[in-house]
Amino acid sequence: MKKKILVAGGTGYIGSHTTVELQNAGYDVVIIDDLSNSNIEVLDGIEKITGIRPEFIKLDLKDKEGTREALKAHPGINGIILFAASKAVGESVQQPLKYYRNNVVTLVNLLELMPEFNIEGIVFSSSCTVYGQPDPENLPVTEDAPIKPATDQRRDHPRYYSRKRSVQEHYPALLQPDRCSPECRNRRIA
């Protein structure tokens, strides 16, 4: 039986390319996206490339009950890849509550619903911003690189953003400690 993956934010640039790769590798894909940073025509492009139109649900993942209903309607999801997040550093400083609601509430909702639907894994797309400015000898940046945000102390600096992103990476182990083995650690895609 084919594995089924939920790609949250799957009509965005990275999400759509990930969907193509998953479908080409033989996975069934369900996309949930609110289309706030993309458009529905992306599904046509995915279908043109792979020959398969992925299942699509237009939904804001901050809506926990709506997310629960979507998961009920699409049983058998094995894992989630989460790209549904706001990502502009400058805007996150200007509108921190908007970013908190979108990025943190979405992640927490999914983590809380995963046990209910026996979804075992989640890949959380982070940001290279958590690493700060890497030393040239440490390039390319790898997922085990030290977190070293910018040193500027002002709240409006990218350091503030990188701290928020770094904290989000630790939520899975905090919210599901009984499901996290010693191997349950962050794997960043830089």
Each language-model region and where it sits:
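Hydrophobic, Gly/Ser/Ala-rich alpha-helical and linker tracts in large acyl-processing enzymes
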Residues: 164, 181-190
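N-terminal Rossmann-like NAD(P)+-binding domain of SDR-like oxidoreductases, especially those catalyzing
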Residues: 1-180
